[in-house]
């Protein structure tokens, strides 16, 4: 046995997973034989923690399918999906629902707000559903960041489209999720409201260390990301760091042939 004077070694500090989410050798196949369609065709991709990743590609390239499978909203036909260190491919539906509720935030093109609840109640609804206490200090910080402090008592019908999407972003942020998946979050908004939402998502990464993965067809929206992934025919075919509008347009033009 070591003597009394032997040095005491503390346990190593926990390390952050290399990827906030990861898809490994992922296939999503519809139909069979002559009618088989491979929406995802052996794709492997990881999403870094505390970074903003955009996913782009032509219509039918598999970008929304990739996001849905990575977020546990749909299942791969073959392959693995990890959220942090959890292989969600092995979870049953109840376990998967719980993981999504606890670890993942969502922002969709459709705002998906409950019309009978106020903006504030919509923001905290996922926490209420999970029986989790609202951190009022964090809630105040989030609603201030997205510019909703004076709109919390309004119903969705009393808010503009841009304001409703701000509620959706705040709802995702207030849960402190491990990762936020955003599917065309500015698709139904005017240019100014779109810029506001993208700024809030960017600020969530820079100020709060949030991880954001966004599907978009808009080259301007993609410039808010740290990294852009390009898909074609269900495969990852290119990526771009520190994107600009011109560099994104050039890559998309090359994919279009």
Language model regions located:
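Pre-NBD coupling/linker segments of ABC/ABC-like ATPases
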Residues: 1-15
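Conserved beta-strand-loop-alpha-helix hinge in the C-terminal portion
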Residues: 235-257
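Compact Cys/His-rich metal-coordination microdomains
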Residues: 2, 223-226, 255
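ABC family nucleotide-binding domain
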Residues: 18-225, 230-231, 236
């Amino acid at each position: 046995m070591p003597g009394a004077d032997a040095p005491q070694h503390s346990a190593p500090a926990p390390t952050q997973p290399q990827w906030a989410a990861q898809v490994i050798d992922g296939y999503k196949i519809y139909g069979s034989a002559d009618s088989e369609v491979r929406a995802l065709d052996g794709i492997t991709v990881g999403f870094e923690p505390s970074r903003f990743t955009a996913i782009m590609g032509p219509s039918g390239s598999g970008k929304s399918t990739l996001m849905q499978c990575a977020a546990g909203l749909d299942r791969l036909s073959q392959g693995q999906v990890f959220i942090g260190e959890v292989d969600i491919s092995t979870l049953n539906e109840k376990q998967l629902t719980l993981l999504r509720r606890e670890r993942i935030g969502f922002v969709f093109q459709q705002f998906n707000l409950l019309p009978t609840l106020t903006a504030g109640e919509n923001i905290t609804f996922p926490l209420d559903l999970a029986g989790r206490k609202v951190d009022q200090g964090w809630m105040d910080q989030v609603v201030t960041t997205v510019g909703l402090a004076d709109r919390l008592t309004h119903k969705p019908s009393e808010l503009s489209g841009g304001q409703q999407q701000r509620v959706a972003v705040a709802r995702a942020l207030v849960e402190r999720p491990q990762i936020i998946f955003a599917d065309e979050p500015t698709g139904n908004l005017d240019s100014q409201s779109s810029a506001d939402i993208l700024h809030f998502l960017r600020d969530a990464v820079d100020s709060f260390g949030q991880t954001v993965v966004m599907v978009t067809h808009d080259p301007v929206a993609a410039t808010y990301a740290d990294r852009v992934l390009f898909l074609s025919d269900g495969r990852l075919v290119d990526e771009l760091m520190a994107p600009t509008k011109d560099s994104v347009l050039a890559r998309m033009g090359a994919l279009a042939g």
